């Protein structure tokens, strides 16, 4: 058993390439799903004419998702290997779920990219790799999945590997840093055991590759940053903000400040899993009570930090963005909604400072008139109402964002510099 070394793992890739099945298979192979649950899912899947979906059913707990055969919200599932305890951040694959992907991937240490052998690099494969790169995921394990569908053909595998390597080159991922694995999540090939169906494949199994990931360094030595997800009023306690600690440590007795609401006080109690704890660390989901703070004083999107070094509030900020899809062009004055940690704020792009080569990061053009899909750029942004952000070089967890408009994610980016209000 691992000594509780923990990894948050994103599972990314195009819709229907087998992400949910892969997650179900990982849970199944590591003994994280009781046998009777799998049997029950099997019966249910067969009744609905979706035989073979039983592993994916493990993931899709919501009835609505089951009916549609689509994974919706980010599902946190856990499994243990020889080296690590993994929490899977199952990243949905459908178009309108990219926002979930961004909030999910930003919580992930590493990612498994699932690419179907019969389909290769698809639009969302491209997009998810782009996002992972922008959001600071360094290690990608690539599962070339559905090998059973292509009769375990080595040439198909090689074709997909070379397509993915080309894609990595375009977004500045080093292809040599990625591990490629020939898998069938459905049949279980090369997930936990080496498969006889792929005698030509001599690389690691998926579980071996996961065990070989580098140890994430929890950002405990950074300043406390805790984006607020919700604020509750609990009788007998009072106002209880809830959120996940991104960096630093929260102790009872700490003096904290909430920004941009600009209120603060002393932490009286901290609760985790309905038990009171003296302190909490990065990755912990906590509810806490602060002396003198009322329900209307703070809101979702506020960030809690130390009173003597409160979270930054941006008057303007400079950011590096990658435009993923926009029907026309983006010019100065454009005001979409920025999603950063738990905040959603309309922000105006005041200026496009330079256009860059997405792969090398070199400047291609100073002060261009516009940017469009596929472009990377540095822009200056003015939030329409106060927004707490940090430069991603200092606190990466509070330095990435998604840009949404017209019901879709049009860009993702990271904060380079904050000009404080």
Swiss-Prot record:
Residues 90-93 are annotated as: G3. GTP binds at residues 13-20, 90-94, 145-148. It comes from Halobacterium salinarum (strain ATCC 700922 / JCM 11081 / NRC-1). This is Elongation factor 1-alpha. It is an enzyme of class 3 (hydrolase). It is found in: Cytoplasm. Its EC number is 3.6.5.3. Keywords: Cytoplasm, Elongation factor, GTP-binding, Hydrolase, Magnesium, Metal-binding, Nucleotide-binding, Protein biosynthesis.
């Amino acid at each position: 058993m691992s000594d509780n070394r923990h990894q948050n793992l994103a599972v990314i890739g195009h819709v229907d390439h087998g992400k949910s099945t892969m997650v179900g298979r990982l849970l199944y192979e590591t003994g994280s799903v009781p046998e009777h649950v799998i049997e029950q899912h099997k019966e249910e899947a067969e009744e609905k004419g979706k035989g073979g979906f039983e592993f994916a059913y493990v993931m899709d707990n919501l009835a609505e998702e089951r009916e549609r055969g689509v994974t919706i919200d980010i599902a946190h599932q856990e499994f243990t290997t020889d080296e690590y305890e993994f929490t899977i951040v199952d990243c949905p694959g459908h178009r309108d779920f990219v926002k979930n992907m961004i909030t999910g991937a930003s919580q992930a240490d590493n990612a498994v990219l699932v690419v179907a052998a019969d389909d290769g690099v698809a639009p969302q494969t491209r997009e998810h790799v782009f996002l992972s790169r922008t959001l600071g995921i360094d290690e990608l394990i690539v599962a070339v999945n559905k090998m059973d569908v292509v009769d375990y053909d080595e040439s198909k595998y090689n074709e997909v590997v070379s397509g993915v390597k080309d894609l990595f080159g375009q977004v500045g991922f080093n292809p040599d840093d990625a591990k490629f694995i020939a898998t069938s999540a459905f049949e279980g090939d090369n997930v936990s055991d080496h498969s006889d169906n792929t005698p030509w494949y001599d690389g690691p199994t998926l579980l071996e590759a996961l065990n070989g990931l580098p140890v994430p360094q929890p950002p405990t030595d950074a300043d406390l940053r805790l984006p607020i997800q919700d604020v509750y009023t609990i009788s007998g306690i009072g106002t209880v903000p809830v959120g996940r600690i991104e960096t630093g440590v929260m102790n009872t007795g700490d003096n904290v400040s909430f920004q941009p609401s600009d209120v603060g006080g002393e932490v009286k109690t901290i609760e985790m899993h309905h038990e009171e704890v003296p302190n909490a660390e990065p990755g912990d989901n906590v509810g806490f009570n602060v002396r003198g703070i009322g329900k209307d004083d703070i809101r979702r999107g506020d960030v809690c930090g130390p009173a003597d070094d409160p979270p930054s509030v941006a008057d303007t900020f400079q950011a590096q963005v990658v435009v993923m899809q926009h029907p026309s062009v983006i010019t100065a004055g454009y005001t979409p909604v920025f999603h950063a940690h738990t905040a959603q704020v309309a922000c105006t792009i005041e200026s496009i400072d330079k256009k860059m080569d997405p792969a090398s990061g070199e400047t291609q053009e100073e002060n261009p008139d516009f940017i469009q899909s596929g472009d990377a750029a540095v822009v200056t942004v003015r939030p329409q109402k106060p927004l707490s952000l940090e430069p991603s070089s200092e606190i990466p967890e509070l330095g990435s964002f998604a840009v949404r408009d017209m019901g879709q994610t049009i860009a993702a980016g990271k904060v380079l510099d904050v000009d404080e209000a």
